[in-house]
Amino acid sequence: MELTLWTYEGPPHVGAMRIASSMEGVHYVLHAPQGDTYADLLFTMIERRGRRPPVTYTTFQARDLGGDTAELVKGHLHEAVERFNPEALLVGESCTAELIQDQPGSLASGMGFNMPVVGIELPAYSKKENWGASETFYQLVRGILSKQPSEQSGVSHSPAAWKSQGRRPRVNLLGPTLLGFRCRDDILELEKLLNQHGIDVHVVAPLEARPADLMRLPNADLNVCLYPEIAEATCLWLERNYGMPFSKTVPIGVGATKDFLEELHQLLEMPAPNPGEGAEQSRLPWYSQSVDSNYLTGKRVFIFGDGTHALAAARIADQELGFKVVGLGTYSREMARPVRAAAKELGLEALISDDYLAVEAAMAEAAPELVLGTQMERHSAKRLGIPCAVISTPMHVQDVPARYSPQMGWEGANVIFDSWVHPLMMGLEEHLIGMFRHDFEFVDGHQSHLGHLGGHQSQTEQQQSQAATNPSTQSNADSSSEESPLWTPEGEAELAKIPFFVRGKVRRNTEKYARQAGCRCIDSETVYDAKVHFRA
């Protein structure tokens, strides 16, 4: 066990809460002490939900440990069923309750409830949140479909059956959850995209799905695995038991969306899509080619996040924006293999770690010009003075925008371009700031319009204060002022030839050079010598 002030993932029961909260008609009874109820805030504060998660806590206390905590569990199960009347009941335990070994799932299964009861055993001390969400979704789908008498294990499932049935092909979108990164907007974008290609969305799960919707999953022609961390285990089970194929490409970025559509059309035996659709529908390809080449090309970028978004970001950065990827990693150990493979293709060694300090150290060593990461990478990048864009959970409330802001599909590519490029400085802007960095507008001690309320002293005030307390400082300043070199008419004429927006910097640099060289007068030759000196 490690003491830390930040974690990329919560314990697995938080993942189970994400599944229960994402769905309708599902209730989760969690055997947990009072302190584990903190997870409610993740949904009401971060996700800005208008209602609490559908979770009942047993909230046992220390004094309860001397009695029969199993009876406490049964009491809360009865209360939850009577009060909420769920269509499906999830039962599990938190990391603390796991030590008591009450096995609440087994208790609930023997209580004769008239709805599906799914007990979830999540190893809290070896697995984490995303695995818990994946396992919960898998167990819920398996538990509900196993109640169907029509289940035929190993039955052949033809993705092209829609042709003989005289209907449009239909697919399931699996994996979006609450506390996922822009999942709700991704679904809207994909529904629109698939409809344009003549494909219907049959079921979206777990987000906003009901248990009855899960029973309809096998009626689709294939499954779309949008977030492998959450849905891959379920897709594999549906493939084994119902013969349902599933897509492997996550449509984040122009190239990936193009590959995604080609994969779907091939699986569904539909005509190939228009290969030029990406350039027609998304602005990213043209924008990335039309901007100042110094703006994007060769920018060093460090990428860290969940496996799905880190892999997508690496492809977009390398192939679509012309960035140079100098770091790639993930905290999702379940996605370590594909991330390592992607890093190897880029000539890198992947960083697989859930230690934010190790990530910050790798970031500092890579010295990128842009960081693409989670909320913690935003903090680390700020400490290092590096621009950052958040591409993955865990995220802050500001990364749950009110506007429509998908990551997938053609519009998602537009959003990604804006999100990644805005933290960077334009080439001309960067050049001008470099030239004017020492001008008074950029001096840290520049007087604020709120200066009368207190705050930092101006540079002049600081010098006067120092001079008042240290007479030698005043005399040194006077002598320095007396020794300032004089500009000859020839030197002033040469200075006038320099563009106005850099003239101040050239004047200061020339005077600095003249003092160092011991020149009492500045003529045209001194200006040229200073220019050579500061360029060297």
Curated annotation (Swiss-Prot):
Cofactor(s) the record lists: [4Fe-4S] cluster
Q: Does the keyword Magnesium apply?
A: no
Q: Where is the composition biased (Polar residues)?
A: 470-483
What are its E.C. numbers? 1.3.7.7
- What does the record note about the cofactor? Binds 1 [4Fe-4S] cluster per heterodimer. The cluster is bound at the heterodimer interface by residues from both subunits.
Ranges annotated as biased composition (Low complexity): 448-469
Instruction: Show the segment(s) annotated as Disordered.
Output: 448-489
Q: Which UniProt keywords apply?
A: 4Fe-4S, ATP-binding, Chlorophyll biosynthesis, Iron, Iron-sulfur, Metal-binding, Nucleotide-binding, Oxidoreductase, Photosynthesis
* One Gene Ontology biological process: light-independent chlorophyll biosynthetic process
**Can you name one GO molecular function term for this protein?**
ATP binding
Query: Which reaction(s) are listed as its catalytic activity?
Result: chlorophyllide a + oxidized 2[4Fe-4S]-[ferredoxin] + 2 ADP + 2 phosphate = protochlorophyllide a + reduced 2[4Fe-4S]-[ferredoxin] + 2 ATP + 2 H2O
- Quick one: which pathway? Porphyrin-containing compound metabolism; chlorophyll biosynthesis (light-independent)
Q: How does it assemble?
A: Protochlorophyllide reductase is composed of three subunits; ChlL, ChlN and ChlB. Forms a heterotetramer of two ChlB and two ChlN subunits.
**Name assigned to this protein:** Light-independent protochlorophyllide reductase subunit B
Which organism is the protein's source?
Prochlorococcus marinus (strain MIT 9313)
